[in-house]
UniProtKB/Swiss-Prot annotation, chains A, B, C, D, E, F:
This is Acetylglutamate kinase. It holds the Pfam family AA_kinase. Catalyzes the ATP-dependent phosphorylation of N-acetyl-L-glutamate. Substrate binds at G63, G64, R85, N188. The gene is argB. The keyword Plastid does not apply. Signal peptide: none annotated. Pathway: Amino-acid biosynthesis; L-arginine biosynthesis; N(2)-acetyl-L-ornithine from L-glutamate: step 2/4. Its EC number is 2.7.2.8. It is an enzyme of class 2 (transferase). The keyword NAD does not apply. HAMAP family: ArgB (MF_00082). The lineage of its organism: Archaea, Methanobacteriati, Methanobacteriota, Methanomada group, Methanococci.
Length: 294, 294, 294, 294, 294, 294
């Protein structure tokens, strides 16, 4: 009997496997979702399974908390303006060392441990991410002031060729969000936005934001207020009405950016929920919030 | 919580999916296992799922009961010698019409209904199965007598080219066990033996016999006596000791034939058990009997 | 001298071989043209030769007389409305068994015997023919009445992928005209119409109707009245003037359907004429009637 | 009736077309066989037909008579030793101009005129024929004397890559027998021998020598003494017994060279016989002499 | 130190190598530029180097002086009208023998000697150049008179398929400017014009005219008056003002023809300047005159 | 004149470009050779040029000095035994961050800046380097003692698939020498030895050690004592005689390892010499020491 249930559950996944066969899913794997070994294992197994059943995950990861820790170790105080890290030369060096030299490799190792073949990359390789310095404006005394965030960039162009090759050869690409400008300078990118840009360029079907919240909720302390499905206009309405505020707003903007770039749906799931990615994709009800254009 | 269990079950399949990735499994789908709609649906879903997760099923089907019914309708009495159907011209016509014209198409339809792409074939297409008339001997009064079974054949050569093309292009081939001799005459083949021959020629990893028994049991009425794993020598021992008798013996010979042809393991499962194929492949304990060389 | 003539005849075919190189010809092989062994050999040899000289035949076959015989054997009376077979469940079963289980295999065998590589298929495999139930209307007392023909369908969509693969790999596809509707039900198709639909979908250059008449004649008893070449408007004119009547009209409609679907020319030839297909294609004068758009 | 005969003749070619499908035939087209326009047309049509029915002709041509004429026009006297043209620098220039600049192009033109796609080459292109200076010995007063033939070479290595590409892309290569030594000097090659070397390197099934004789005859004036099939040992026997003498001996040696290099059969046919190549290949009895190893 | 200079020079070529990577350059190699062994070596080495660094040269050669010499040897007087050779049948034969049988092969040999893989072709092979008889008009007594130049043609269509294959397989094609009309007659083509036509058809980036002058100069005796870069309108201006006259005008027209056909720039360089092709391409200043559309 | 010299120098490289076309060169780029911006530019330009002229560089880099600096900044003292870095967990983290997160990216950036397409990798991606913990022995009081170096490994297996794909798609792979053991733990590898192992696995023609010495010299202060070419036995002789001592010995062992693994020649060049790689490859005399088997 228990056996039968197992089989039924496998079979339940079949329509989803058929539907998403050969599609690309961009997984934005946030630093806050990498809280413990177990959570990291859940994600890794989910992504390897996706790959084996014919869906192509492409990972863009963050690493904010770890970067902060490394900075503090070196006696530097992290500073953010509008959710973007102020990045001087020394900070950029730390960002790259932590993202590319540590977190990226850890994700690759986990994926390979569970049977996947992964390739760690930054936006520097194969001219993957061409970026330009981001000009940030701030309103002060009802005047627009230009703020210098340092070596912070925004995506100008994504050259998908290298990723296409790797995906086609059955690798899972794992990308650190560092871009290069036309002078060859590295730039620190916001991982959420970059993920949306890459998803759009790759014609990804879905962008799945693996975060540390369950999704968009009316009341963050009440799981029953979680929205399963929202349209952009509903979200804009919620922002206007003050239901969505603070740190969530830049993430929401990244979601809308992805939809604008051609992604069909964006999903916010909680990396601390066991196998959240798999459940969001392979079950009717899902576990997080799905955002669609309309 | 229930969600979590679902995901865990999917993930449990991962090592098996990795291990069998890109391999070929020959599914011998027996006529006695096609007892009802539900059982046929279970098998079809299992095979489509296998295909989508990167394992390549190739189906060889039987159809004995249905052939008998058709013959009786036409006023002919089915006759068997040593488990092989005596096949005159008229019988051969009925065999072909039922196998190729009915059962094969029904299997193809089921597979396509659940999202697979299937192609129905007989051994006549693409010179798939070159056969020769089978010479059957009988011991009578301690004398070896040659028996004429009529248009009954045994496989001489399997040309895998057509199947290779179809498998590579992501189709599930469904094969009726009719062969052709060098004069172009059709011959009725024993589906169990033919399945083993095709499995060997295709370098299939497994031959899965979907039957109407749970496997090899010491006492057919006591499920607890089911053997999970047997070697050829253990089986030979069981035959010698009289544990395996009667109608099971030709099937066992077909299993040994497959192992001789290079198949790594043969599995006997019960098509009436829900999702028997999936459970046999994707769970540690399995549901039937696995036979290996040693 | 005789030798020389032989060579000259081979060479005469050269311009046609050049002209039609790599093109696809849809051969509608009618049940009435399969009258005897010799006639079946002629056709088979013609098609194998076409394949070897670089022209790609695709066969769609009928089988009306054989189906009628099988039905009568089972005590059923064939019934037709407007040339379409009224098809209840039992009839459909017989149609499939005869077409797929018998005639299709016989054609495949013949082709393979003369050196071709053939693959027998029905519209069920590889989602080849998606069909829908045909709604037939009848005029009665100047009122349009809807007639239920049972499991009779018309082609909704032809998925050419499987055929393309087989043709490219140098197989001759032989197709039984059975389609599948969106619920997975099989439907009996008119072979003439289906052949035109497949020809159009495959971008076939020619549709060759192998029948039991020499072509379109003003007087069916006077061979000298055979038309070698007709345009659609000439044919419409002949119908209006009553030169073409009765059973020929549905066939003519099938020809016009094929031209509408993009076929360059439709040819009606007599399968009882030795090597009619070859002669129609490879000689200036031809042996049957060619119909072109204008 | 006449129509029927035509078709039968086409069909008679079928077994040969099947048998030789995709094989390569090396056609040595001798200068003496290019006697008139009509004969040149026969050969060209034969080769184009071969190509279209799936057999791949590769042409190596001679041009002795035309070279002699050109030399005489320039006031030079052709000189031969053991059938090899003594070749000083000026002669080599004439040889190249006539072979590459005239005869090769004429053959290409004829082939293209009848629907073929041909490419004219010499052994200079694509390092096709690496040659070395031929050391010729002469017995004089029972002493072996080395003779300097000038710029005459023998094949050292055939690089088949260029020809393989052209054949695969459906071109007919037409090759002038000029080789290049390791210092980059051009060398005049004996076309018969070179044809055998190229045939061997290309794994050609047949070498067909298109000459101005009907084959090997016991009495050159009695057509009835023509041998249809000979083995090497039979030929050696004939030479010993004096049946084969004079100018025929070097040609025979070229035939044996080809068989040694792996060609299955060598055919000697008369280019003045209409469609000799076609008849030799596509009829049971042939028109010339076939030589096989044993 | 000297070593360092060597390396610097190699490195200086890098931006040009990057820029022109995988592009096609049409090299028109004029007969007047083949003056001596050394000059021929320079060109050959330049082209082989280009090929190895990833730029694809395609050579169209002339051979006027050599043709004249051959004609005179045969007692014929070369005759030109408006720079086009009057070409009777005998002249055409000489043209083909010299161009295809001699000069083409010499270029191929040189290229192969320096490590290239070259293939000699005329416009006759692979239907490369389809031409038509050129109608030439002359003004006489202010009347337009049609002049018969004999077998002189102009390009009607270039079939790039053969060249594409050869370039892709890493060969350097060397083309003699002989075309074929629709009746299969060979026609003598002006090499300058043909080179432009082929360059356009092949989507060549550059047409490089290797001549015996340094480029376009205001005063042909004063090297310092050489124009490095000119636009079409500047050139037209120069012609109008009488700076460009005589034999240079047809060459200029050929340049403009190439630009019209889509070539990005045409270069006139002096084949007697050591490595003129390399220097023109790989140095900032160049050595000849570059002509661009505007 | 100067122009001519430039061209001559380009042409001088031609034989080397031909000879090494399509081969793979493993470049071991040592940390001591990355002393200044200019030296890093020289190397980057050299490698990009190699790639463009058809030679495939694969880079394995070191980074010792930079790792030391980073460790010291964090208050850790680098410790070496027999030239291998003692590597505790914290050290390994620093090693990875510096190698993968900083140096690797810097090399990639330089290569891309000069027109190359580079991909940064560690041995973790695509299961590139499977390693095992290195057991190091020390002789102490004439007793062999096992020393624990911590997370230090040696290459067990190189999976070339990912590199093969990247090389074939025209990328320059840049590899940080970090391996993974069977438990998924990262291990710090000696870059010299790893470079030889990868070179052998990739069938590289050459291993070029870019160091901070000019090569092997009898007297390190006397440039004139530099050996241009040495065999293994000559080197062993020099070691025995005490000409090669100290820090050079492990490097020499790495060279011999590479030759053992099948590399044809190992070159030691000085990264501070302008364009040392290019000069070593493209000039007769070279600039460093070449070591060959015999």
């Amino acid at each position: 009997m228990e056996q039968y249930t197992k089989a039924e559950i496998l079979i339940e996944a079949l329509p989803y496997i058929c539907k998403f066969h050969d599609q690309k899913f961009l997984i934005k794997y946030g630093g806050h979702a990498m809280v413990n070994e177990q959570a990291r294992n859940w994600i890794a197994k989910d992504l390897v399974l996706l790959k084996y059943v014919g869906i192509n995950p492409i990972v863009v990861h963050g690493g904010g908390p770890e970067i902060n820790r490394a900075m503090e170790k070196m006696g530097k105080t992290p500073e953010f303006i509008h959710g973007l890290r102020v990045t001087d030369e020394e900070t950029l060096e730390i960002v790259k060392m932590v993202l590319i030299g540590k977190i990226n490799g850890d994700i690759v190792s986990k994926l390979e441990r569970y049977g996947g073949k992964a390739v760690g990359l930054s936006g520097k390789s194969g001219q993957l991410i061409k970026a330009k310095k981001k000009i940030q404006y701030l309103m002060k005394d009802s005047q627009k002031i230009e703020i210098d965030l340092g070596m912070v960039g925004e995506v100008e162009h994504v050259d998908t060729k290298l990723i296409d090759i790797l995906v086609e050869k059955r690798y899972i690409p794992v990308i650190s969000p560092i871009g290069v400008d036309h002078q060859g300078n590295d730039l620190n990118l916001n991982a959420d936005i970059a993920a949306g840009d890459i998803a759009g360029a790759m014609n990804a079907e879905k962008l799945i934001m693996v975060t540390d919240v369950d999704g968009i909720m009316d009341d963050i302390n009440d799981q029953s207020t979680l929205h399963r499905r929202l349209t952009i206009s509903q979200i804009e309405d919620m922002i206007e009405k003050g239901f969505i505020t603070g740190g969530m707003i830049p993430k929401i903007e990244a979601c809308i950016n992805a939809l604008d770039k051609g992604v069909q749906s964006v999903h916010i799931v909680n990396g601390k929920t066991p196998h959240a990615v798999l459940l969001e994709i392979f079950t009717e009800e899902g576990v997080g919030t799905m955002i669609v254009k309309e």
